[in-house]
């Protein structure tokens, strides 16, 4: 049975949620899996169409959603693919326990990406990064841009509920932003297409390997099983920086999100969200209140306002150990292993 979906009304009707409760009484039955960069590259098509992202203080490109739709139409005519296309057509921002909004770029992810540029991930040695519910991955890829520019070894872990989001949006965005870091291009061009040859993919993979930029992709819901998957490779409290945006809208999933945040943060966590999600119960205030009860030092939390227009937006800082005590001239090495 197809799950009922709904659409957030933040753009046309800022003070109204058009739909229904996104909460679920139980965890969705989706596979929890990890994948490597090398294996994921097979999902990259021969051409990628992109658009520059507005609203950022730095250059960033992302894959066009119509390009994702074209790829899905060409490779699969199943009912499952039809459901994916309905999501891409904009009928539903969310389908509870099926699709969690990862194809779209949300305003709070732009706020978070801009904030990342202020904290200087290189200087502060925040070189092990996890983004929970990454979607288009603009925040973590803004970190990638800094690490790549300075040739800094790092570990980047991209987590999303949907494996298709990782395959068709997250990874292409990583490739595109690497490409624009390495190739001369017209900075005024807002849209374009790049040819993706096997040699380009090999160059991409080899270049990240030479720089010791290690990437891993995790799909599935926030849960003990997901944490065990992370723990087997990294252990607990491994990530110097944990990022998330638009992940606190659903009260039923908030407990699991907090669990993942607490288990994985070593130094600093940044969580961006709307001050209130009308109709679904989530809010920055509720998130901050619950987190205060769980951290050792409530004074390690602070919230900054990023917008007061329409539905207000904020970013919560959890400075667990920040600046890190291990800051020195040598960046933290990523985990050993192949890309």
Swiss-Prot record:
One GO term (biological process): cytosolic large ribosomal subunit assembly
A GO CC term attached to the entry: cytosol
InterPro entries linked: Methyltransf_16, SAM-dependent_MTases_sf
Catalysed reaction equations from the record: L-histidyl-[protein] + S-adenosyl-L-methionine = N(tele)-methyl-L-histidyl-[protein] + S-adenosyl-L-homocysteine + H(+)
Subcellular location: Cytoplasm; Nucleus
SUPFAM superfamilies: S-adenosyl-L-methionine-dependent methyltransferases
Keyword Ribonucleoprotein found: no
Enzyme Commission identifier(s): 2.1.1.85
EC class (word): transferase
Sites bearing Phosphoserine, chain numbering: 333, 338
GO molecular function terms noted in the UniProt entry: protein-L-histidine N-tele-methyltransferase activity
Keyword field: Cytoplasm, Methyltransferase, Nucleus, Phosphoprotein, S-adenosyl-L-methionine, Transferase
Record bears the keyword Acetylation: no
Family from the record: Belongs to the methyltransferase superfamily. METTL18 family.
Role of this protein: Protein-histidine N-methyltransferase that mediates methylation of target protein on His residues.
Protein name: Histidine protein methyltransferase 1
Organism: Schizosaccharomyces pombe (strain 972 / ATCC 24843) (Fission yeast)
